[in-house]
Regions:
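A residue-level structural signature of the nucleotidyltransferase/glycosyltransferase Rossmann-like core
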Residues: 74, 94, 127-129, 198, ...
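Hydrophobic structural packing positions in well-ordered secondary structure
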Residues: 80-81, 176, 217
């Protein structure tokens, strides 16, 4: 799809979003640009262009945009944090995606026997890039770009597996502490005495991330705050100390379980970062 065709589709079909423009993806995504050497980057700049659009914080409809890329990699998140929620029956599970994550079209098929509703909510102002089949054709001479996008899809899957493992913890305080430190590894900012997590996370949203009800989350957060582990509110959270100092007092010392979790999760938290997703093993 050319820029003219995409812009025409945006206008005629009423696609959501604003500030639609055609941009060089390598200028917007520094990590992607770093996949290429200087000369390759110079040659690829003119080809690695994509339609970009923005969305304000709040509910976002991405289904129509995803319909524009049935044969392409998908919609790439450039900036912001997006809550992607899946509803089956009366239960909702949520995943947070951010810069570098790739969203694919919602494929249906006979193997899907359960009705599942997908919704998106921008927690922060968002910018996206539309990577369609035309984009793939333009960058075919630089396979590093496609390989990097494939690795990112794998990274997102691993992050989701980590979140599922966190949700399996029996104690809700432990689930919340692990989740917040996990999110801090990606979006946290080091501050004196701990890490600041500048993402608007309501109690309801936290519950949807770790399979818990909102009232229980509120009580668990109050207990964490009373212990000096976590402070803050819906717009910003502060994680005090380091994860290896916080978890042992929250976990029953059964068969050294607390020590195993601390050894993996807290390896780098003293420097203000949570562990890498693949380091979580218990």
């Amino acid at each position: 799809m050319s820029f003219g065709e995409a812009r025409s589709a945006w206008r005629s079909n009423g696609l959501p979003g604003h500030s639609v423009s055609f941009r060089c993806l390598l200028d917007l995504d520094g990590d992607l640009a770093d996949e290429l050497d200087v000369e390759s980057r110079r040659l690829a700049r003119a080809a690695a262009t994509a339609l970009t659009f923005e969305a304000d914080a709040g509910p976002v409809s991405l289904a129509d945009w995803l319909d524009q890329v049935p044969d392409g990699p998908g919609v790439l998140v450039i900036d912001g944090v997006l809550a992607l929620s899946s509803r089956v029956g009366d239960r909702i599970a949520t995943e947070l995606v951010g810069a570098g994550d790739l969203l694919q079209p919602l494929w249906g098929g006979a193997e899907h026997l359960l009705a599942c509703e997908i919704t998106w909510r921008a927690l922060l102002p968002m910018r996206f890039a539309l990577l369609d089949a035309a984009f793939v054709k333009r960058v075919r001479f630089w396979p590093q770009i496609g390989q990097a996008l494939l690795r990112r899809a794998g990274r997102r899957a691993i992050n989701l597996d980590v979140q599922r493992s966190i949700a399996a913890q029996p104690r809700l305080e432990v689930r919340l502490a692990l989740l917040l430190w996990h999110l801090a590894g990606r979006w946290g900012k080091v501050e004196p005495g701990g890490v600041r997590l500048p993402i608007p996370l309501t109690h309801q949203l936290l519950g949807q991330l770790i399979a818990a009800e909102r009232p229980s989350v509120s009580h668990a957060l109050a207990r964490l705050a009373a212990g000096g582990f976590v402070t803050g509110h819906g717009d910003e959270w502060h994680l005090r100390g380091s994860v290896e100092h916080s978890l042992p007092s929250m976990i029953d010392p059964v068969a050294g379980r607390a020590d195993r979790i601390v050894a993996t999760v807290g390896a780098r938290s003293t420097r203000g970062a949570a562990c890498e997703p693949h380091q979580l093993r218990w």
